[in-house]
From Swiss-Prot:
Provenance organism: Clostridium tetani (strain Massachusetts / E88)
Family from the record: Belongs to the anti-sigma-factor family.
Substrates-to-products reaction catalysed: L-seryl-[protein] + ATP = O-phospho-L-seryl-[protein] + ADP + H(+); L-threonyl-[protein] + ATP = O-phospho-L-threonyl-[protein] + ADP + H(+)
Pfam families on file: HATPase_c_2
The EC number(s) this enzyme carries: 2.7.11.1
Keyword vocabulary terms for this entry: ATP-binding, Kinase, Nucleotide-binding, Serine/threonine-protein kinase, Sporulation, Transferase
Origin organism lineage: Bacteria, Bacillati, Bacillota, Clostridia, Eubacteriales
Gene Ontology BP terms: asexual sporulation; negative regulation of sporulation resulting in formation of a cellular spore; sporulation resulting in formation of a cellular spore
PANTHER family named among the record's database cross-references: ANTI-SIGMA-F FACTOR RSBW, ANTI-SIGMA-F FACTOR RSBW-RELATED
Name of the protein in its database record: Anti-sigma F factor
Role noted for this protein: Binds to sigma F and blocks its ability to form an RNA polymerase holoenzyme (E-sigma F). Phosphorylates SpoIIAA on a serine residue. This phosphorylation may enable SpoIIAA to act as an anti-anti-sigma factor that counteracts SpoIIAB and thus releases sigma F from inhibition.
GO MF annotations in UniProt: ATP binding; protein serine kinase activity; protein serine/threonine kinase activity; sigma factor antagonist activity
Amino acid sequence: MFDNMMKLEILSKSENESFARATVAAFASQLDPTLNELTDIKTAVSEAVTNSIIHGYENKGDKTVKIEAYIKDKELTVIIWDEGIGIENVNLAMQPLYTSRPDLERSGMGFTVMQSFMDELEVKSEKNKGTKIIMKKIFNN
């Protein structure tokens, strides 16, 4: 089981990304993270939510991005998913600088950022069914 959990659903609008980031950070603060750890979590959540909005739903603001966070012992698990277009090749998408939308002038560093700021990252996706991102951060304090 888990010690605590939260759930949040937001419309796929870019203005909701900061709310999602702040909400997960507030939830994580019960683990007494350092300022750097909190910044890492906020950045990773921001990247995942932005990916759902821009790539999963192609900026269609009437869809739902779902976020859950769980605390067990000293570990935070954050799950962010959409029911968007999915990722055809997850391994390719996780390569630094890869972007499926070069027309948007994005850097293609979202998954790289998530990997570097969290202790674990798992991406599950199915074409035309959506993407689920599972991230973990372990606290040693």
